[in-house]
Amino acid sequence: MTKALWTVAEVARALGLAGDYPETPIDLVTQDSRAVKPGSLFVALSGTPSGGFVSSFASSRDGWEFAANAEQAGAVAMIVPHRVDGISVPQLVVPDTLIDGLWALARAARARFHGPVIGLTGSAGKTSTKEFIATYPGASASPSSFNNFWGVPLTLCNADPSASVWVVEMGMNQQGEIARLTELSQPTVALVVNVQPVHLEKLGSLEAIRKEKVSIARGLPSDGILVLPVDLAAPEWPGRVLRFGAGADVHAMSKVPAGESWDVTADIAGRHLAFSLTPGAPHRLHNALAALASVAAAGLDPVLLARELGEVGIMTGRGVEQRIGEIVLIDDSFNGNPASMAAALDSLQARPVRGRRIAVIGDMLELGDEAPAYHADMVGHVTGIDGVYCVGPLMRHLFEKLPPEKRLGWHEDPATLDASQVAALLAPDDVVVIKGSKKIFWVNKFVQKLAAALQASN
């Protein structure tokens, strides 16, 4: 992209502001003063979300308090709730910097783009699938996991107007959030990667989760296409549906190990194509098929995406393997729910090993009243695993059901888990998987600590 994303004058018009504003170019829209660089538009969001949204990262400070920092870093304009003293760049004053500012600019961004837009959601694998689709030539996609009430509008505001396709990831922290995000994004293709028992504590049932995820179709035009797994119902959507998975419109015909990758042959709605895929978590092929189905639904050439899939690495914390001495460590710590936990354990059980198969697994959060049962039920997925170390209060329900010979230990508080003690339980030729909800291992950087402890013991 050679032309600037916006000018200050264009932003002012998008916000409905009267007056004369300069044609100063803007190359980045951000709400984070630490991310500001020369040519940025700084959006000073409130520390407490407005618009009825909720956030687990609410702040006691408001964005306008960092206006001076943003200007010093190179901001050429800023959206603020009131004029801030000492600021020399244009201040675009609106009553609510989220709804009247960031969301209004996002609507203007979407209105000026006339190419295909793929919106996607799901209980797990959203970001990995988005990264697959983002490799399509000329695509513009959400950075990182920008999938909430500020991440989605930022994605739209920063998307390249000349892109071949926009890719917009959508998540949720409360019921009804996906419907609002999809109505803002107005996708031409909507993808639901999967529906799993995640956020049960917030939504109450798997059916409520299904409804929330399928509500992404509310943003589709009448001729839009909803892309779904083969086993997911969506009676709410009366329009066209394209399905992926075994026996569906888009499915894998074969998957053959080929050195450090898989050679896959797939049927994409009657068109056969071959591609390579880096091995990883069991759902990796599922996500690749979802990406191919979405690209085909958008009227793009899936062959162009297939050529790129083999170059997409595994994202940190989502099944990345590393060998430390004679031990293989599988980092699947980014998140965990009953479906992905079972898949990770089943994959470990099926893996040929010279030593032992070891699982270090932590609590799966936000499962509501059924949480103890979901944890205890994992006992059916460790039959072929030699040792299990449980972390967190909920994992005690599994620990107590384990055969004594499989019990490596149970630690209640993830924050005080000693990586060196876990490392001492491991032996040469062991294959170890680390899996749990984000707050158990990922936030505490446990995998890095365990890797360091193993390296120190070599």
Predicted regions mapped to residue ranges:
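ATP-dependent carboxylate-amine ligase
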Residues: 1-19, 36-43, 47-63, 188, ...
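Short, basic phosphate-binding NTP loop
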Residues: 2-119, 128-132, 157, 400, ...
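Short internal beta-strands
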Residues: 76-82, 194, 227-230, 358-362, ...
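Active-site regions of enzymes building and remodeling cell-envelope glycoconjugates
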Residues: 87-95, 139, 238-253, 402-412
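Residue-level signal for inorganic ion chemistry
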Residues: 11, 40, 70, 105, ...
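Short gly/ser/thr-rich secondary-structure transition/capping motifs
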Residues: 19-29, 100-103, 147-150, 170-175, ...
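A short helix->loop->beta-strand "cap" motif at the edges of active sites that frequently abuts
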Residues: 73-76, 89, 115, 220-225, ...
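Phosphate-binding loop of NTP-binding sites
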Residues: 98-230, 234-240, 448-457
